[in-house]
From Swiss-Prot:
Subunit structure: F-type ATPases have 2 components, CF(1) - the catalytic core - and CF(0) - the membrane proton channel. CF(1) has five subunits: alpha(3), beta(3), gamma(1), delta(1), epsilon(1). CF(0) has three main subunits: a, b and c.
Compartment(s): Cell inner membrane
Full protein name: ATP synthase epsilon chain
Main location per the UniProt record: membrane
NCBIfam families tied to this protein: ATP_synt_epsi
Keywords: ATP synthesis, Cell inner membrane, Cell membrane, CF(1), Hydrogen ion transport, Ion transport, Membrane, Transport
Database matches in Pfam families: ATP-synt_DE_N
PANTHER family hit by this protein: ATP SYNTHASE DELTA/EPSILON CHAIN (PTHR13822), ATP SYNTHASE EPSILON CHAIN, CHLOROPLASTIC (PTHR13822:SF10)
Keyword match Hydrolase: no
Upper classification of the organism: Bacteria, Pseudomonadati, Chlorobiota, Chlorobiia, Chlorobiales
Function: Produces ATP from ADP in the presence of a proton gradient across the membrane.
Annotated GO MF terms: proton-transporting ATP synthase activity, rotational mechanism
Length: 88
């Protein structure tokens, strides 16, 4: 499937494994000061995360969500990496 013009690459990594790697159009994550949303073209960012729900809008227009146990979120160019202790 061709990636959307609005999509960007996201990797979600735990110490044990690569949990997710793919194209998304939006990520909503639990920052220390509240929820924040990342979309393609976002300014570079490094943010600490608290435990909570992460929501993904995938490039095929489906959605997914899961719980994380804190971590960090980095955006650079059109790539984002979410590092977390655990995902469920």
């Amino acid at each position: 499937m061709a990636s959307s013009d609005k999509a960007f690459k996201l990797d979600i990594v735990t110490p044990q494994k690569l949990f997710f790697s793919g194209e998304v159009t939006s990520v909503i994550a639990p920052g220390l000061d509240g929820l924040f949303q990342i979309m393609k073209g976002h300014a570079p960012l490094l943010a600490a995360l608290k435990s909570g729900k992460v929501r993904l809008s995938l490039s095929d227009k489906s959605e997914d969500s899961f719980q994380i146990e804190g971590g960090f979120f980095e955006v650079s160019g059109n790539k984002a990496i979410l590092l977390t202790e655990d995902v469920s």
